[in-house]
Amino acid sequence: MKQQKQRIRIRLKGFDQGQLDQSTANIVETAKRTGARVVGPIPLPTKREVYTVLRSPHVDKKSREQFEIRTHKRLIDILDPTGKTIDALKMLSLPAGVDIKIKAA
């Protein structure tokens, strides 16, 4: 039988692309420093939500304003992680604007 390979999949989400790229670079650098193999960061499609509101509360129905929120996503796979890798990732501090989901497989 084949031996099952260990893998950690990290999904990052955020509204600010600069913070997100900085966080992914920080995670990749930490994982490589501890000796694990890293695949990524893979940019996933950006979700764009548009909200349309009336400019005036009373009249001018045709006058509207649009706002948008873009949600940027990244995917990182860490192959063959060691105990040092997991400990280093636990100690890593990320900015508040970045949502992180970690799945071990």
From Swiss-Prot:
The keyword Cell inner membrane does not apply. Coiled coil: none annotated. GO terms for molecular function: structural constituent of ribosome; tRNA binding. GO terms for cellular component: ribonucleoprotein complex; ribosome. Pfam families: Ribosomal_S10. It comes from the Bacteria. InterPro entries: Ribosomal_uS10 (IPR001848), Ribosomal_uS10_CS (IPR018268), Ribosomal_uS10_dom (IPR027486), Ribosomal_uS10_dom_sf (IPR036838). The keyword Protein biosynthesis does not apply. PROSITE patterns: RIBOSOMAL_S10. One of its GO terms (biological process) is translation. Keywords: Ribonucleoprotein, Ribosomal protein. NCBIfam families: PRK00596.1 (NF001861), rpsJ_bact (TIGR01049). Belongs to the universal ribosomal protein uS10 family. HAMAP family: Ribosomal_uS10. Involved in the binding of tRNA to the ribosomes. Part of the 30S ribosomal subunit. This is Small ribosomal subunit protein uS10. The gene is rpsJ.
